[in-house]
Amino acid sequence: MAHATHASITFDEGPHLAIGYATLRTGDFRLQPVHIHPPLANVLAAAPLLLQSDLPDPRAVDGWEIASLSAITDAVVWQYPHPARMATAGRVPMLLLSVLLGALIYRWAKDLGGWRAGLLALTLFTFDPNCIAHGSLITTDMPAVFFMVATMYAASGEWRMASGEWRMANGKWRMANGEWRMAAVGVLLGVAQLAKVSALMLVPVVGVLLLIQGLANEELRITNCESRITNHASRITIHVLRTWAVVFGIAALVVWAGYGFEISAVPGGPFPLPAGTHARIFQSLREHYELGHPTFLMGRVSNHGWWWYFPVAFVLKTPLPILFLGFWAVLRLMLECWNAGMLKRLNVKAFERANVQTLACRTLPGLSLFLFPVLYALSSLFSTVNIGYRHLLPLLPFLYVGLGVWSTKYGVGSRNGEWQMANDKWQMTNGELRITHHASRITHHASRIPPYSLLLTPYSLLLTSYSLLLLWLIIGTLAVSPHFLTFFNEIAGGARGGYRYLVDSNLDWGQNLWDLRAWMDAHGEDHVYYAHYSPARLDVYGINADFLPPDPRAVAFAPWNPAPGLYAIGATVLQGPYAPDVNTYAWFRGREPLTRLGNALWLYRVPPRETPTWAVLCAGVSFSSDTVAQRLGGGDLRVLWPDCAHTSVYPPGQQPGVLIASPDTAVPPRAEVDVTLRSAGGETESVVYRLSGSAPTPETPLSAVEVDGPLDFLGYTLHAETVTPGDAILLETYWRVRDVPGRPLSLLAHLLGPDGSAVAVGDGLGFPIEQWQPGDVIVQRHSLAVPVDARPGTYTVITGAYWLDTMERWTITDATGQTGDTIRLYRFERRE
């Protein structure tokens, strides 16, 4: 209940409430195909809203005629002045269904393994933070899970009267339940279809279970402990077909009743269909899968997801104690099979000798428990809509029941698993494991453990281990309260580290508006810039905010130079999904937040700073001048395009600028990383550096040198002290633009050998003269490769400039008044 009363209305809850209320108020299902969900969960959640007299009539909302879901949701939910009242009212039915689901999990596990199994399964469900979070929110998830589990429980045959079970009686396998149970299966199957479209996967699974039950329910004659089928295949076929007709016929009728027995047209269909809205929902779902859905996984952003999304989500969002129990169960089962020799003894002949009915009876409980979750898990690998761990919720009840039953039968609390003292040896009572499978019988005696200490008995160790795991689960869940939605296990770094791996409904669903208001009140803040994909209206929460992209109400925003103020940014848009592009909030992504509200809403304080007036775009950067100007806040921005690998440019004045380059581009030493931009695949694509207004000073200034040309020579920096054959001498020459020339030119850099000839040449100019302005400082980087066969002697580094069209060098006058066409910068002595 803590999560239900603490969380603000989340992204999906608004449409669910609005559609449910509109359906109940009008009896019209026009919004269901738009939302791509059947109506059951919506109307269950919205039923309490019928008691609210201050909600508008959906038919009076502008947009009703065109089935505008956003307009109806805004009018019914987001503008409602009492969001806490609406959220609590809508979440109560979801909480009740969660309680019923817990009871169902307990009952199923108890039927299979006794009350200890039921209690363990219920404990795992009760303290799973994911179930707590989604079980208290208005979505289709928990209703769908409940009716899926209820359908499978009924179809399994475990739903029985006190005497009802699969057993041998009068030489026949009989199930105590009658045809009424088949009708109940049909009703539950139909209701599940009305809860969520993914419940369609129940249909083939239920069909298989009914087929197996049909095989198991046929009359058999018992001879020499082996069963033989006496009825003809036709009788089995008729029985199964009759059962299918009853169950699926009732399910179809329930679905039709759920839509008010409507008969409506389906786009592309030749004639109207019963429950045509349901068919249109599947058409919308197909379009949705084709278009994809924004999603994030470990730094990557995609609209069509990855096959490994849900496996990663399961590993990172499932509590580690549950993962350990599951791993231990699988490992123990494999060891049991290996020790018993099952893998060696089962063969084709055993299958041939096995009785079909015996097989059916013995495999039915396991298939009932694991067939659906296995198929569901496999289907998730092919999903192109990867929006959250919540789509794995249907797996969890089956996992809990399985762990509860396994743990009590082969772990703690089982009559087959209790260790007792016998003949001065620790021995497992009833340790004989009999597995009869296809007429094969395997007997496995329990291992015997020396009596070192009562506390070190296998049973005591198991009991202690289970107790510690459950304690770990409970403490870990309570530690994240009331922010259960943001739970991540220790592999992901806990709730505070989960944003690096998964977002959206895994972490940030717009649930922290009450936290934001409380923080602003506590710190005396009266305004915030708010960035989130939820269309919530913050004024109904008492928050004065300006919205940022992707909200259609967004104010002007400069992603690389945000205005000063307080910013609240959801972890989802921070990582890229739903935002205009993956780097909309990259400026914030590279900075530590002021605080994190509920692990999902990040607060930043942006201080005032000067707006850049110039930008340098290096090769490999795909931004246009207009794009750069917009992301820096507009205004009069000068954009330069030098060859950044060899040239740096600094406009005159003291105004700051930025340099945008690929991550492997060499940048000036004083450049500070301001924004790191990444691709949709997660790799660093380019980096925005912030540069101070003044140009750097050369290590060796030579301002007294006069150059007969449009440039003034300022000095140089030499990154070498010796001449080493095979190495390169790195030289930086500094020039200031005096005038803009009308002809091409180049800057000279030579290494002269002992005889005065050039042994290395590094001429070049990486800044087109078309972009020059008087006062620009050009830093040209030259590389002079020393020959590997360089002779001993004196080597001289010189520089200068010349016109490219005539190759005429400029006249240069040094400080002594001597003239020439080069400037001697440095001399090296190369000795033997």
Residue ranges and their predicted role:
Residues 25, 29-93, 266-304:
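Interfacial juxtamembrane loops and adjacent helix segments
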Residues 204, 244-249, 366-374, 407-417, ...:
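Signature aromatic-anchored transmembrane alpha helix within multi-pass, membrane-resident enzymes
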Residues 340, 411, 417, 453, ...:
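C-terminal luminal/periplasmic domains and tails of membrane-associated envelope-modifying transferases
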Residues 154-160, 178-180, 188-189, 202-249, ...:
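Perimembrane helix-loop-helix junctions
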Residues 58-73, 105-127, 180, 184, ...:
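Transmembrane-helix signature of polytopic, membrane-embedded enzymes
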Residues 313, 318-347, 352-355:
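Hydrophobic, aromatic-rich transmembrane alpha-helices
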Residues 121-126, 153, 189, 193:
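Short helix- or helix-capping micro-motifs
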Residues 92-112, 150:
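Transmembrane-helix motifs of polytopic, lipid-linked glycan transferases
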